[in-house]
Amino acid sequence: NGFPDVESAAEEILLISIQDYNTKQIRTWGLGQFNNKQDNVIYKGFNTEYELLLSFINWWMIEDNTPEVITGWNSELYDIPYLVRRLDRILGEKLMRRMSPWGLVTEREIYIAGRKNISYDIGGVTQLDYLNLYKKFTYKAQESYRLDYIASVELDQKKLDHSEFDTFKDFYTKGWQKFV
């Protein structure tokens, strides 16, 4: 499906983006250069994943930067576990634990339909997974819970079209500007 496996977390992280919903400012760390044309975006480009992750965790560990709440679609079972595992693999456990203001990052196994999933509790940071919230608080089952499908049903919007690229890898290697 184009997404790297969470358990092995074998693929490099290419981008990390965070939006402050109070200021609307977006901060992005990327594995490559980007021609930023938006006033509300701060983009930092890096040559290696190590540099990207180190810059990110150094920013995150500053008390005023560590969010009280993080949100995302399927972030509990994908984004956060993948990020935590890559931080641990590339920077080591000590820096990975800085995701928590208290140094408390705990792995959990969650079984859904008999399939093992990995999740992490980050002490001091509340995680709100929009996929879980959507399933819990909407009373109509959907044929799919892919973000693109739900955005279409609920907002009449689609994710960014990248059909001009044959593969997802082509998208981020040949269309970096659009990918970011």
Residue spans of the language-model regions?
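Conserved DEDDh/DEDDy metal-dependent 3′-5′ exonuclease domain
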Residues: G32-A141
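Residue-level signal for well-ordered alpha-helical scaffold segments within enzymatic catalytic domains
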Residues: N1, S17, S55-W59, Y82-R85, ...
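Active-site-adjacent structural elements in folded domains
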Residues: G2-F3, L52, T173
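Short acidic-glycine loop/turn motifs at beta-strand connectors
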Residues: D20-K24
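Non-catalytic, well-ordered alpha-helical scaffold segments
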Residues: E11-I13, P81, L128, Y145-D148
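C-terminal or mid-to-C-terminal helical accessory/interaction module adjacent to the motor/catalytic core
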Residues: F137, Q142-E143, L147-F179
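Entry/capping segment at the start of metal-dependent catalytic domains
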Residues: N1-S17
